[in-house]
Amino acid sequence: MTELELLGPRASGEPLGTAVLKAVAEDFQVDEVLDIPLSGQGEHLWLWVEKRDLNTEEAARRLARAAGVPVRSISYAGLKDRQALTRQWFSLHLPGKADPDLSRAEDASLRVLKQVRHQRKLQRGAHSANGFTLRLTALAADHQAVDARLEQLRQQGVPNYFGTQRFGHGGGNVHDALDWAARKALPEQRNVRSRLLSAGRSYLFNQLLAARVADGSWARAQVGDLLAFTDSRSFFPAGEAECADPRLAILDLHPTGPMWGEGASPAGAAPAQLENAIGARQPALCQWLAQAGMDHERRILRLPIGGLTWHYPEPDILQLEFVLPAGCFATVVVREVVDLVSAGQTDSPCVF
């Protein structure tokens, strides 16, 4: 499956050129934002960890081994990219135990930067946002055009697609999810089950968002929409008055799309008709998600880009800094500006 099939059309026009992202880990830096004051005491040891070219699950296993505890005793708020330099929190459950020596877990790919005790473990999804610093190298695009596009994105946001990372190489996770859905069965391994359910659900959401981008309604509230604030999981229906709410214009309030699961969508009017039409394309997948116990939830269609700044350290390097809500993808911001190519493709005359 192509990127266009997995995500959908761009909202800002054609890409302005090409660039490389993640030539080295330092080109893609992520800092987890966690608004939880830590008490300094308790049976949970919280760790602020820097990882380089290491995924979250492997880091958790290494920390658990070094601490001498089962991997189920370690928690984290969210998964971070492997091919990146990331800093995120973990927590170890150590009732009645002293702080362990974690040096055995450390090497060039993992460093424990800070450790603090707290009364509670770190919950999944507890982080409020992620801060990104991206360096796009081998940039082949006009700076003035890039500046204008980024200013447009700062003011209008971008479609809140799930990035291709969610779907595996070539959309393999989606293919696998569709296969399991057709068999009306679930993988026994919990991590595989979670990955495929997430991929299937995200794929359906992207299909809905792609249709809203195509008809220009992704950033505009319609009667029957369900609206939500950027950092809220609650939502409310839109009537004529709500569609004129000034908070829509300043990117505080957004239309939402369905995260398919058990129960009918509370949307109405034209948005409900579109959601039903998208679901009708993949009835087995929708039923599979519901039978797996997934709840019907909502996700904002428009992604505001917090604190967006940029500069050019070199003529062919664009550095971006911004903050996104938890669960949102930095690469969907970049794709609205340039096409990303692998480092080995940048010398091809056909790229630009």
Swiss-Prot record:
Active-site residues, record numbering mapped to chain: D81
InterPro entries reported in the protein's UniProt record: PsdUridine_synth_cat_dom_sf (IPR020103), PsdUridine_synth_TruD (IPR001656), PsdUridine_synth_TruD_CS (IPR020119), PsdUridine_synth_TruD_insert (IPR011760), TruD_catalytic (IPR042214), TruD_insert_sf (IPR043165), TruD_pseudoU_synthase (IPR050170)
Annotated GO MF terms: RNA binding; tRNA pseudouridine(13) synthase activity
One GO cellular component, as annotated: cytosol
Keywords: Isomerase, tRNA processing
Biological function: Responsible for synthesis of pseudouridine from uracil-13 in transfer RNAs.
Family: Belongs to the pseudouridine synthase TruD family.
Protein name in UniProt: tRNA pseudouridine synthase D
Encoding gene, per UniProt annotation: truD
